Design a protein with these regions (language model features):
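Catalytic cores of secreted/periplasmic or lumenal enzymes
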Residues: 18-537
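Fungal secretory targeting signals
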Residues: 1-22
Length: 537
């Protein structure tokens, strides 16, 4: 089968395509954030660490190093005996502790907050920041899993400090689940990038100036093993190795904990990359025992995006969207895409929906490891009496047999029970009450045979916590009321909710029914709504 032959062409093992993927997945948003780094549709997560030595806060900072540091400090409170702690974003509540000095942590959350949502937790984004920082700096490709759950309060203290002795450090790492070899590897890999901030550790650098930033090694902005080779050759510039006050030379004590056996093995560049990949994967996958992580998130071959089915004029349903095709191993110039679809009663249509490749930036997005994705867009209409229930994606490559993607035999589902009427929904930026709030109006079309069932939209409220950079997300339900007579087999429902202006850009779900008979449209954006609601045609 053609799909199998394409999979066999894969990149590195952890970037191989997951044939078991079924759309939609609750991790679709995270997959997009990780793989759509540039181009036609981009999330740009790598922007914060490109080039590797970059920091928006100036030359005495290195964001890539800070992302890795934040993830480690967050994970460091894990206890293998109790199963408590781990990578859970609890560090956002722990910044008043002496073990977490400096602005690196809030700086990290200041960036990842831009991507946090009900589908992408802060802790998953912290894990992803390690993956992206490593790749942006020429380091190993670290497998990324999802499913972390954000803490809502501080965890126990336990981050190792530079003035602690080797026995204490060994015990702390053992509590986290790492043996002596792994402790050495973690510190060596974690100190490839960046250095020590004098403003946070003047007792180490001897200079409390903001610009004091002695680096761990001479290649601090490139993921190499110079931290190892310089140490073994007695050429180290690491102030945690050659500092004037030996009490704070924690790297020296840790690196030599097994008489340099581990450091000597890490002098081989290939082994260094492999060991850093594995130890960073262990680090970001160290989570509370109550959390179950997903399989490794790999690039998806065929993925619908931004699908919209809406009630239109003259008893029609407008159907728009795009199909994202992984063209890393395909020549997109030779590819065309069409959809074969099934009507509301699951009857296969004898016509197909054509698509057109996106024009801007050739319709292509790019990711790490030379990943390429090409978008094919469509805009069509159905009669309301026939509608659509699912579709398959047909990929035609010139000179080859067609490849039909059936979403593992299920078809790509499209529900026509409840529809977002985007033109009739809006968010006027006009203050409507003494609290300084705006109105958010959501309008949906509900199929006539489902009228009488409860209709609502579930809106994600961002709760701001003083002194904490991340928000706690709460789902609030707003009941919608019928607002029209029957229109082509549908009724319009609407609701208006006053919201604080800082909540203007969030997400919501449309919900029809209850119990076992619920239809949903999920992860819709308020930020995409116009400022004026239009009347229905």
């Amino acid at each position: 089968m053609k799909t199998q032959s394409l999979i066999s062409m894969g990149l590195l093992p952890i970037l191989s395509v997951n044939a078991a993927y079924t759309w939609p997945s609750k991790y679709d948003e995270l997959e997009d954030i990780l793989y759509l780094q540039a181009g036609y549709r981009r999330y740009g997560f790598r922007d914060g660490v490109t080039p590797c030595g970059f920091s928006a806060d100036g030359s005495n900072r290195e964001t890539a190093a800070e992302w890795i540091k934040t993830a480690y400090h967050d994970m460091a409170t894990h206890d293998v005996e109790t199963g408590l702690g781990g990578l859970d974003a609890s560090i956002a509540y722990e910044l008043g502790r002496a073990e977490n000095p400096g602005s690196a942590f809030n700086g990290t959350f200041g960036f990842t907050n831009n991507y946090a949502s009900i589908k992408s937790s802060n802790s998953d984004l912290l894990a992803m920041s390690v993956v992206v920082a490593s790749m942006a700096c020429g380091g190993p490709i670290i497998p990324f899993r999802a499913g972390r759950i954000d803490a809502v309060q501080a965890g126990v203290p336990g981050v190792p400090q530079p003035d602690q002795d080797l026995a204490t450090h060994t015990a702390i790492f053992a509590k986290q689940g790492f043996n002596t070899t792994e402790m050495i590897t973690m510190v060596a890999c974690g100190h490839v990038l960046g250095g020590v901030h004098g403003v946070d550790f003047p007792q180490i650098t001897g200079d409390n100036n903001e610009t004091s930033f002695p680096h761990f090694n001479s290649q601090y902005d490139n993921f190499t093993n110079s931290i190892v080779t310089e140490y073994l050759e007695d050429k180290s510039i690491d102030v945690l190795v050659v500092g004037k006050n030996d009490t704070f030379n924690s790297d020296k004590r840790i690196f030599g904990a097994d008489n340099n056996k581990t450091m000597t093995s890490l002098a081989d560049p290939s082994n260094f990359q492999a060991q850093c990949r594995d130890i960073f994967a262990r680090m970001i996958d160290t989570v509370p025992a109550s959390v179950t992580l997903s399989e490794v998130i790999t690039p998806i071959e065929v993925k619908p995006t931004e699908l919209s089915l809406a009630l239109g004029a003259n008893n029609t349903l407008s159907f728009t969207g795009s199909i994202r095709v992984r063209t890393t191993h395909r020549n997109a110039d030779n590819v065309t895409v069409s959809l074969r679809y099934r009507d509301r009663n699951n009857n296969l249509s004898n016509t197909t929906i054509s698509t057109e490749r996106g024009r801007w930036q050739l319709g292509q997005s790019y990711g790490f490891a030379r990943e390429v994705f090409t978008f094919y867009e469509f805009d069509t209409a159905f009669d309301v009496t026939s509608s659509i229930s699912s579709f398959d994606v047909i990929i035609h490559t010139a000179g080859e047999a067609d490849e039909i993607n059936t979403n593992n035999g299920l078809g790509f589902p499209v529900s026509d029970a409840i529809l977002l009427q985007a033109p009739q929904s809006c968010q006027p930026q006009i203050i409507v009450n003494e609290a300084g709030q705006w109105n958010l109006t959501i309008t949906a079309a509900v199929r006539a045979d489902r009228v009488g069932e409860p209709v609502a939209f579930d809106w994600v409220y961002k709760r701001f916590i003083q002194g904490v950079m991340i928000n706690q997300l709460e789902v609030q339900r707003t009941v919608m009321e019928k607002a029209s007579e029957e229109i082509g087999g549908y009724y319009l429902y609407t609701a208006t909710k006053p919201i604080d202006t800082v909540q203007w850009s969030t997400t919501f779900d449309l919900v029809l029914g209850e119990g076992d008979n619920v239809s949903k449209l999920e992860f819709l954006s308020t930020g995409n709504l116009a400022s004026t609601c239009q009347p229905f045609p």
